[in-house]
């Protein structure tokens, strides 16, 4: 039996965050926000995974980040996906060139993976959000 999840509503301020001098008049809450509602659009098709490695660093995805993955989304050109290629899980961007399918890293230290006939490749889901700490 599935447990009912308790919502955690946190304040969402209506004012934008200033990169300069903040206005004291912007000190009010517009509404509350539950992060689950924000990042999980399809609960039955969503999972989280922690990143290991730096092949996607130029896409803003760092070692140790947590990814929100949605299995219900179409893995189209340009999307970042989790794929199982010949038994190995990889995090890459989908690209098509000359009628061929590639999984591209976002770090020039790594090579793209060309998906060739006979290879096993299953897309497990599309990355929708990246969660990482900045401190």
Please place each PLM-identified region on the residue numbering.
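Structural motif
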Residues: 64-65, 79
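Short, hydrophobic/aromatic-rich segments at coil-to-beta transitions
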Residues: 44-46, 76-81
